[in-house]
UniProtKB/Swiss-Prot annotation:
This is Large ribosomal subunit protein uL22c. It comes from the Eukaryota. It comes from Drimys granadensis. The keyword Magnesium does not apply. Gene3D superfamilies: Ribosomal protein L22/L17. GO terms for molecular function: rRNA binding; structural constituent of ribosome. The gene is rpl22.
Amino acid sequence: MKKHRKKRSSSTQVQALAQHICMSAHKARRVIDQIRGRSYEKTLMLLELMPYRASYPILKLVYSAAANASHNKGFNKADLVISQAEVNGGTIIKKLKPRARGHSYPIKRPTCHINIVLKDQSKTKTQQDFVLENKGVFKDTIIERYPEKEREREREINFFKRLLRFPNWNRDK
């Protein structure tokens, strides 16, 4: 059976994947949540100072992703930002611990898969690029998807504008 993978924009993104890390996924997520969205240099400083065991394999993975970016794509490491970082549960390694009188206790070692995607910040599209692509018409996708929210926001703005016309509206006489 083939696994369908997400297609990534190859022009501005680079990824690195570490599989079968002997650590539970929720302990690794505690560290990953701190670095998501940060720049490459700030991430390195954070990971070196964090007191968690999960920070070392994640640090190695961020180094690897940055090396992929500079070697394969020619990106500058100072412009890299962690755009996506995810931790998925892996297989559970099951062992038996021998105990007294021929008994044994099961030992379960959880593993996880860590995926980090770095994005080159200098090559991201600006608003001006979107305007040029749409032939001079800039479309805000959030407003298009939720027109009722935009109308509600305009009503609130108009309400406060009306209140500002009367500066003494709440003053007691």
